[in-house]
């Protein structure tokens, strides 16, 4: 996202990332600040590496390992990088938070807290137990 903003500073750049991915790459918020390349990062916090958990559940129902996370406060983490930090816990909170992020004139991080059971908006892990997934 930072490279996209540097290449096209006139554009609004929005990064969508899961909590596990952000834990591995969140330092990009510091890079955005350092190079004055404000982005909006939307971090979906489901307290786990659920893309990995999804495959474990499909292949080994009820036997997930190493996929639950104890996460930091991502909104506060964004603030520590000089970004506007926002937290969303209900659907109706998202649009106002998104509008604030777009108007911030600096980077913003929106932490969207989601249920651990959801892998995607339409798929619950309990529904995947024992099902063959593409690539498995």
Predicted regions and their residues:
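Thiamine diphosphate
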Residues: 1-136
């Amino acid at each position: 996202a930072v490279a996209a903003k540097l290449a096209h500073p006139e554009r609004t750049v929005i990064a969508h990332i899961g909590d596990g991915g952000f834990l591995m790459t969140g330092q990009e918020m510091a890079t955005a600040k350092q190079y004055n390349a404000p982005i909006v990062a939307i971090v979906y916090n489901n307290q786990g590496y659920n893309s990995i958990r999804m495959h474990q559940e499909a292949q080994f129902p009820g036997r997930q390992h190493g996929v639950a996370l104890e996460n930091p406060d991502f909104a506060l983490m964004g603030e520590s990088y000089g970004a506007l930090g926002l937290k969303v816990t209900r659907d109706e909170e998202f649009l106002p938070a998104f509008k604030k992020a777009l108007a911030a004139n600096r980077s913003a991080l929106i932490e969207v807290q989601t249920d651990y059971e959801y892998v995607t908006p339409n798929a619950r892990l309990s529904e995947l137990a024992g099902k063959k997934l593409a690539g498995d």
